[in-house]
Amino acid sequence: MAAQALALLREVSRLEAPLEELRALQSLLQSVPLSELREQAAELRLGPLFSLLNENHREQTTLCVSILERLLQALEPVHVARNLRVDLQRGLTHPNDSVKILTLSQVGRIVENSDAVTEILNNAELLKQIVYCIGGENLSVAKTAIKSLSRISLTQAGLEALFESNLLDDLKSVMKTNDIVRYRVYELIVEISSVSPESLNCCTTSGLVTQLLRELTGEDVLVRATCIEMVTSLACTHHGRQYLAQEGVIDQISNIIVGADADPFSSFYLPGFVKFFGNLAIMDSPQQICERYPIFMEKVFEMTESQDPTMIGVAVDTIGILGSNVEGKQVLQKTGTRFERLLMKIGYQAKNASTELKIRCLDALSSLFYLPPEQTDDLLRMTESWFSSLSRDPLELFRGISNQPFPELHCAALKVFTAIANQPWAQKLMFNSPGFVEYVMDRSVEHDKASKDAKYELVKALANSKTIAEIFGNPNYLRLRTYLSEGPYYVKPISTTAVEGAE
C-alpha cells in the first residue's frame, strides 16, 4: 500500500491540477501504517505538495494539509528541519491558518528533538516568522507559536537566540499589534521566566518583565486584572517569588488591596489580587504571609459578606487553598469566632447558592476538613468544631445536596464525606445517622462514572481507617472491604429462575 501511495505522490507531482489524485492519496494514506511509510521515507518527495499549497484553491489546500500531516510524521525531525526549511518558512506566512498550524506542528516536533533544534536556532528568518505568528488573529496559531518559542528557550542557545539578537526587537514589535497580542507576549515571557533563575534574568534584562509589572501596578483596572494572572503564574516558582519580593511587587499589590475600598472599580482586579496572595501563602508559609500582609485575610473575610457571587466565590476558593495544609488551617483557627461565622456563611451558600457556587463551597470544605493520617487530638477537635459550625445538622445538609440530580453536586458532596472519613468523630456521626451506612453501601444511587468513582473513594477512605471496625462494627467493616475489592463499577448479577412452560 505504501508503494501505491508513492505512485500517487509521483502522479501528483506531474500534474497541474491533481485534485482527483489528491483525493485518492488522502483516502489511501488513512489505511497505510506509519511504519510502512517510514520504511519509504527516503522516497517521499514532498516539495510538489508544498508547492500546491501556494495556489489559491481551498479544497486543494485542505487535501494537501491532510496528506502532509500524515507523510511528515514518517520523516525524522532532523530531516524536516534540514530539507524543508524553505517550505516551513513559507508555511508560516501562508494566509490559510491550517497551513500555519501544520507548519508550527512540525516546528514543535523539531524543537522537541535535541539534534534538530539547532537547525532552527541557526535559521533567524524562521524564528522571526514564529514570533510574528503570535500576532495572528487565530488563537491556535498564536498558542502553538508560544509553545514552540517556550520550548526553544529551555537551552542556553535558545535563550541567546531569543534575547540577544534582533529577535527581541521583533518580539517588541509584535507586542504593538494590540492589547491581546501584548498579553500573549507577556504569557510567553512568564513561561520562559518560570523555568530557572537564568531564564528569569534574561527576561528581566530584556525589559519585558519590568513592563509587565509596570502595567500591573498602573491605573488601568482591566489591565491590572489581566496582568495579575500572569504574575501569579510567575509566583508559582521559588525564584519568581524571590524576584517579586526583591522588587517590592508583593508590597505594592498589598497596598493596592489596602486602597481598594476607595476605588469604585476595584471589583475588576480585587479577585485576582486576593487569589495571588492565596497562592503565595500556600506555596510559602501561610502564617508568614498572613502576618506580613494582614490586609489579605481581612479582605477575604470582607468578601464573604459581599452580595456579589463573584467575590464570594473567590473568597471561598481562597479559604480552601489556605486551609489545604495544616499550617493554613491553624492560621484560620486563630481567627476564632470570626472563622466560625464564615463557616456558617459557607454552609448557607452550599445549600442556597447557584450550582456553580455550591460546588466551589463544597470543594473548599473538602480542603478545609481533610487531615493527613498523622492526626492529633487538637486537630481533630478543630475539624469537629468547624463541622458543627456549618449548620444545625451538617451531615444531613451534605446528604441532601448529594441527593440532588446533578452529578457535579453529588460528587462534590461525596468529596466532603471522603475528607472527614478517616476522623473518628465523623465516623461516629455517620454511624449514628439513620440510613447513612446503607447509603454508603448502596451502589444504585450512582449512575455515572464520576459519581461511582467518588463513592468508591469514600468507601476506600472509610475501609482503610484504623478506627472504622471499632466504630462501624465488624459486619459493616467487612461490607466496606467487599465493596472495595469489587471495585467502583461492580454490578450485582440478577438471578433468574426458569419456569417450566413459560414463553
Curated annotation (Swiss-Prot):
Keyword vocabulary terms for this entry: Acetylation, Chaperone
Family matches, as PANTHER family: 26S PROTEASOME NON-ATPASE REGULATORY SUBUNIT 5, 26S PROTEASOME NON-ATPASE REGULATORY SUBUNIT 5-RELATED
Function summary: Acts as a chaperone during the assembly of the 26S proteasome, specifically of the base subcomplex of the PA700/19S regulatory complex (RC). In the initial step of the base subcomplex assembly is part of an intermediate PSMD5:PSMC2:PSMC1:PSMD2 module which probably assembles with a PSMD10:PSMC4:PSMC5:PAAF1 module followed by dissociation of PSMD5.
Modified sites of kind N-acetylalanine: A2
Keyword Mitochondrion: no
SUPFAM superfamilies per the UniProt record, alphabetical: ARM repeat
Subunit note: Interacts with PSMC1, PSMC2, PSMD1 and PSMD6. Part of transient complex containing PSMD5, PSMC2, PSMC1 and PSMD2 formed during the assembly of the 26S proteasome.
Gene Ontology biological-process annotations: proteasome assembly
Annotated family: Belongs to the proteasome subunit S5B/HSM3 family.
Keyword set includes Chaperone: yes
Organism: Bos taurus (Bovine)
GO cellular component: cytosol; proteasome accessory complex
This protein's name: 26S proteasome non-ATPase regulatory subunit 5
Lineage, opening ranks: Eukaryota, Metazoa, Chordata, Craniata, Vertebrata
Domain characteristics, as noted in the entry: Rich in dileucine repeats, which have been implicated in trafficking of a variety of transmembrane proteins.
